[in-house]
């Protein structure tokens, strides 16, 4: 099998679409976290420790998502620059994209777990 370690135009175009999708998804997740946080604050809590813990988890998830969003944006900008300057040998861009893919996957898992915990807590607090 012949491995190509070049960021050809097709690969760069794919990565740009991938990054755009990630940025959109993270933005949607952050908007939903804002909404869930609002619901969390609007209900009466029997145990403030649970609410406080969930608020801390929301804050952490929001910070992690913001950092990931920034990293994706930097990669996106780099790929556009590579494309515009016809750089096809930016091996680091390939590695960075793979690392970002793993970070996005982990971030999504944490988000889903937090979302489920929040939905459960909110639904039992009425």
Label the predicted regions:
Residues 1-126:
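Charge-rich amphipathic alpha-helical interaction elements
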